[in-house]
């Protein structure tokens, strides 16, 4: 879903008051478009009888042995239903507040208690997609922040290390055409004076949830 160039009022499920309260800023249209793309993928997945959904953003680099590793990952998860996971992050930049589950096929699967912010490659379970569709309809934060906060709180996120995919290294067009017009992102986001404080508050809250789940 390409949200670039659209006004915020065109997104009927966007709550700008909540965004300002949580983030201290507004979302920009391309962030909302990205959110809707992920949400739409989850909804379409639930209309099928598939057990798992792989979501890859279009600006990624697929790392060596991707298909082999992905197949072994899904095979392992399919044989270990007791993990009761929602989402696997395939693109973690680093491991934070994590607990290893198993090493197979040259990589490690781990409990991502502090769920990685980089959401360019994900694997969904049906339970995870159902929960996202139910809880995530109203857009209040960028989708990667939603995933990090939600999965750090419920402890149902997993990760792989080394990552299977990574950003391609090209500049994201998250600002769309306005980037070429010299409009600063800060102004576009309508940041309040509390933006920095709220960012730190959110980070420490999510880390608290992660530590609690790690120690439980």
Map each language-model feature to its residues.
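An acidic/histidine-cluster motif and surrounding catalytic segment
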Residues: 1-56, 60-216
């Amino acid at each position: 879903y390409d949200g670039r160039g659209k006004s915020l009022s065109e997104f009927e499920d966007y709550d700008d008051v909540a965004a300002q309260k949580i983030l201290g800023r507004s979302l920009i249209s391309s962030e909302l478009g990205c959110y809707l793309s992920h949400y739409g993928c989850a909804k379409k997945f639930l209309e099928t009888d598939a057990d798992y959904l792989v979501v890859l953003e279009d600006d990624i680099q697929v790392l060596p042995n991707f298909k082999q590793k992905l197949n072994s990952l899904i095979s392992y998860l399919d044989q270990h239903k007791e993990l009761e996971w929602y989402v696997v992050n395939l693109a973690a930049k680093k491991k934070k507040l994590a607990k290893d589950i198993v090493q197979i096929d040259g990589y490690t699967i781990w409990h991502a208690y502090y769920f990685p912010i980089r959401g360019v490659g994900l694997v969904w379970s049906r339970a995870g997609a159902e929960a996202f569709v139910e809880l995530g309809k109203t857009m209040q934060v960028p989708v990667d922040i939603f995933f990090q906060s939600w999965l750090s709180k419920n402890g149902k996120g997993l990760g792989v290390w080394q990552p299977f995919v990574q950003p391609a290294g090209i500049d994201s067009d998250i600002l769309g055409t306005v980037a070429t017009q010299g409009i600063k992102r800060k102004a576009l986001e309508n940041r309040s004076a509390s933006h920095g404080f709220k960012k730190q508050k959110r980070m420490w809250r999510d880390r608290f949830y992660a530590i609690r789940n790690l120690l439980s």
